[in-house]
Amino acid sequence: LCPSSYQVGQDTLSYVAAMAKVTEQINFLAAVRCGELHPPMLARTISTLDHMLKGRLTINIISSDLPGVKLSSSERYARSREVIEILKQSWTQDRIEFNGKYYQLSLSTDPVKPYQQNGGPLLYFGGYSPDGVDLCAEHCDVYLMWPETEQKLQGLMDDMTNRASDFERLVQFGLRVHVIVRETEKE
């Protein structure tokens, strides 16, 4: 997971672009806060990065507030849903035809399609609220979870599997943990 733009700071997509030239094998999980960039521009940027990385790009969908803009949890997930649907249209179709609450678009898609010809980079998503879980079940590829008890993780995985099956989809699972490695225990 690349430096996240969850807090205003380093731009994750710029960081990934810089790392593309100095790496050959590592895959990058770039956090993208939905609503920060106009979705057609975001689709083009991600497609370009995917080519630079020769398919080593994955995207972590973030549904947080934007600086100076406060939305309810359900509104943030609704905005993320619209962004994802526009990304997918941009990556797989010749036109974007979208009429949502946050975006109304009718335009040709960018000629740059992702390097990954399976619909674009894998979309990762983490969140426990019902709106977030539904969004992941319908549109994302990997459900990220935090360390929990084995029983809670199994319950989350079972719930996601059931919700995804309602959309005739399979979702993979990931566990986000932070590992601190030092020479000694004291460090």
Regions found by a protein language model. Give the residues of each.
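Active-site-adjacent structural elements that line small-molecule/cofactor binding pockets in enzymes
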Residues: L1-E187
